[in-house]
Regions:
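Terminal RNA-binding accessory module
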Residues: 1, 6, 378-467
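Proteins enriched for Cys/Gly/acidic motifs involved in redox and nucleic-acid/cofactor modification
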Residues: 1-238, 277, 292, 314-325, ...
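Radical SAM enzyme [4Fe-4S]-AdoMet core and its adjacent flexible, acidic
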Residues: 43, 239-256, 260, 307-310, ...
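Conserved SAM/AdoMet-binding glycine-rich loop
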Residues: 105-110, 117-119, 222-345, 356
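Short, hinge-like loop/turn segments at secondary-structure boundaries
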Residues: 126-128, 150-153, 246-248, 282-283, ...
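Glycine-centered loop/turn positions within well-structured domains
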Residues: 141, 191, 236, 301-302, ...
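Short flexible coil/turn linkers enriched for glycine and charged/polar residues
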Residues: 176-179, 189-191, 288, 298, ...
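Hydrophobic, well-ordered secondary-structure elements that form the walls
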Residues: 294, 335, 355, 363, ...
Length: 467
């Protein structure tokens, strides 16, 4: 039986809001406006969490700045998904000792998935004495209280309760865009893929109530947001813990029926929980972007079993082919791991053949990175690093060729795009399927839906002109 999520009481959230007011008054009594910098590593869920951290900081009187130099408060939101991300965090946190030497009253906090690992917290505690506070993803809603305690006492604080499994509604948000918005619909993961640290640091799956999600989305539409992405470690499991009879496809449909001009997206999905009902829902509603990120990770059944993915190559292909059958324009993207422990050359060839069969629009490709505490980290891994790099290059070459061929097929066609910014002399936009389009135009077009005729392409983007 699914555990129901624990919703943080409004009284507790009101207390945190009051603390924000107290911090703001404390800074006002000192006669100046403090500044805060938030640095984010990792996935879109971390981006959404950082928006809430910025919201709490602004409610506490801080101006949000884009550099750590001179900031009164620095928050680093960390990622634990791969070793490279952790190495970068350690390096950058270490460098902050010099920044703090120039600004002794500066307060430095670390949060995010790395702080859900006890060995990491111990390392920070013992080797990074200039760090003032640590909190894991479950304690994010308590950040104002933690900040106030550090400001008042000057003592370090480590809030890493792992009993977790909560939902906190109504936390203030400072969004990074006034056009595109992240909306977290659930947190955590129950899948325990053998290589993945996420369930250990984010906790078990817990879903927000549909009425709370709809309330947030309605507010975004009213504020003029035109590209809304629903977030979860596995959105296809949405609602199982609520017992309301509302699944992810139902939630998507209820949002897609709201008035307004916007595109609705989602990530990430797990193939074992993806359904034809979800594909049918995407096909039915014009506001739902015809884009599906469906990670396959490997094209070989033995490797998939070792990964604890709970589906086969054939089951995955049936889903992918069904999506393309009912939506020929469906943009399919995916994640794939190269060099999983014990992967043979023949098993790697199965991955290449799956890529050729599905013909993904884009892939996010990774070489296996062992994560301490996961089953895969203990598996025998005889494949040399050089061989893994060679396979990685072959896979990237295969996908780059396919991506270019797909893009070449768009030359001469007219596509609907949402203009989202500028890079040097060109405007940038995204198609319904998430493809990057560059074209000449005036900044007044930013934020608008337009029809653009495609005149050229590269492997990674399209070039067009407004007719």
């Amino acid at each position: 039986m699914e555990r129901k999520p624990v919703v943080i009481a409004q009284e507790e959230l009101a207390r945190e809001a009051a603390v924000c007011g107290e911090i703001k008054a404390w800074w006002a009594s000192r006669g100046r406006t403090p500044r805060a910098y938030v640095d984010t590593y990792g996935c879109q869920q971390n981006e959404a969490d950082s928006e809430r951290i910025r919201g709490m900081l602004r409610a506490s009187g801080y101006d949000i700045v884009d550099t750590e130099e001179g900031a009164d408060c620095i928050v680093i939101n960390t990622c634990a998904i791969r070793e490279h991300a952790e190495t970068r965090v350690y390096g950058n946190v270490g460098a902050l000792v010099h920044t703090k030497a120039r600004h002794p009253e500066q307060k430095i906090f670390l949060c995010g998935c790395m702080m859900g690992q006890p060995q990491v917290v111990e390392r920070i505690k013992n080797s990074y004495r200039h760090v003032d506070g640590v909190f894991n993803p479950h304690e994010l809603w308590r950040f104002p209280e933690l900040l106030q305690r550090v400001l008042k006492t000057g003592k370090r604080i480590f809030a890493v309760d792992d009993s977790a499994g909560n939902i906190a509604e109504g936390i203030p948000v400072v969004r990074s865009s006034n056009l595109k918005a992240w909306v977290s619909i659930m947190y955590g993961c129950n899948n325990f893929c053998s290589y993945c640290i996420v369930p250990y640091v984010r906790g078990r799956e817990r879903s927000r109530r549909p009425e709370e999600i709809l309330k947030e989305v309605k507010g975004l539409i009213a504020a003029g947001y035109k590209d809304i992405t629903l977030l979860g470690q596995n959105v296809n499991s949405y609602g199982k813990d609520l017992g309301l009879g509302v699944d992810f496809a139902d939630l998507m449909a209820s949002i897609a029926e709201l008035p307004g001009e916007f595109w609705l997206r989602f990530m990430t999905s797990h193939p074992k929980d993806a359904s034809k009902k979800l594909f049918d829902t995407i096909a039915r509603y014009p506001k739902i972007a015809k884009q599906f990120h469906l990670p396959f990770q490997s094209g070989n059944d033995r490797v998939l079993k070792a990964m604890n993915r709970h589906y086969t190559r054939e089951e995955y292909l049936k889903l992918a082919h069904y999506g393309r059958e009912i939506m020929p324009e469906l943009v399919l993207t995916s994640d794939v791991i190269v060099g999983f422990p014990g992967e043979t050359e023949e098993e790697f060839e199965d991955t290449l053949s799956l890529i050729e069969e599905v013909r993904y629009d884009a892939l996010f490709t990774f070489i296996f990175s062992p994560r301490a505490g996961t089953p895969a980290a203990k598996m025998d891994d005889p494949t040399p690093k050089e061989e893994k790099n060679r396979r990685f290059d072959r896979l990237c070459d295969t996908q780059n060729r396919i991506s270019l061929e797909i893009h070449q097929g768009y030359v001469g066609r007219t596509l609907r795009v949402l203009v989202d910014g500028r890079e040097k002399e060109m405007l940038t936009a995204r198609t319904e399927g998430g493809r990057l389009v560059r074209f000449a135009g005036d900044d007044s077009l930013i934020g608008q839906f337009l029809d653009v005729t495609i005149t050229g392409c590269t492997t990674w983007s399209l070039v067009g002109e407004v007719k």
